[in-house]
A protein has these predicted regions:
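Canonical Rossmann dinucleotide-binding motif of NAD(H)/NADP(H)-dependent dehydrogenases/reductases
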Residues: 1-11
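SDR active-site lid
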Residues: 154-173
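Active-site loop immediately N-terminal to the catalytic Tyr-X3-Lys motif
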Residues: 76, 124-133
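Active-site helix of classical SDR
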Residues: 98, 137
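Residue(s) in the substrate-gating loop at a strand-loop-helix junction
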Residues: 121
Length: 173
């Protein structure tokens, strides 16, 4: 909400279209909800077209990747589908969003290139018992981010990893 308070146009991804109106009402006209699942390349591509149209030649200042899930339990009880869902959401989903939105982050139409912020967690650097799926996906996200950071140096696009410690959010419900 700080970006909105400073007058920036904020695009926020949501999976449930029914949340569009309440979020728009809560955050105001500078909040544009985008309905897509980060694991669905086609949905993200449609959102990209909407953002590109709204920006009308301007660049996207920041891409924040924050999609996540946390299904906890011992490895012997986690299904391969649950493990796969962690990787698809946090790693492949981030890859999808970066790849699709990257053209809007370049400095072609603006004096300064955009930034990519990938939200990790303490689980991205330290494995925890009963969190193998979550920690594995966060480790992979950090590896992807480090590689991307070096790859995008030539374009002066900064890649930032933020790894907050645990705090109460809906992911733990």
């Amino acid at each position: 909400s700080e970006f909105l308070e400073r007058g920036f146009l904020v695009f926020g991804s949501i999976r449930d279209k029914k949340m569009s109106a309440p979020l728009r009402k809560k955050y105001g006209k500078n909040f544009i909800p985008l309905v897509f699942d980060v694991t669905n390349y086609v949905q993200i591509s449609k959102a990209y077209k909407k953002v590109k149209s709204i920006l009308n030649g301007a660049n996207l200042g920041i891409l924040i990747n924050n999609a996540g899930i946390a299904q906890l339990g011992p490895v012997e009880h986690i299904s391969s589908q649950e493990f796969d869902l962690h990787l698809k959401t946090m790693v492949v989903g981030t890859f999808n969003c970066v790849q699709i939105f990257l053209p809007l982050l370049s400095a072609k139409n603006r004096f300064s290139p955009g930034k990519i912020i990938n939200i990790s967690s303490g689980g991205g650097s330290i494995g925890q018992p009963f969190m193998a799926s979550y920690c594995s996906s966060k480790h992979a996200l950090e590896g992807f981010s480090e590689s991307l950071r070096r790859e995008l140096l030539i374009h002066d696009i900064k890649v930032i990893i933020i790894a907050p410690r645990a705090f109460k959010t809906a992911i733990w419900d």
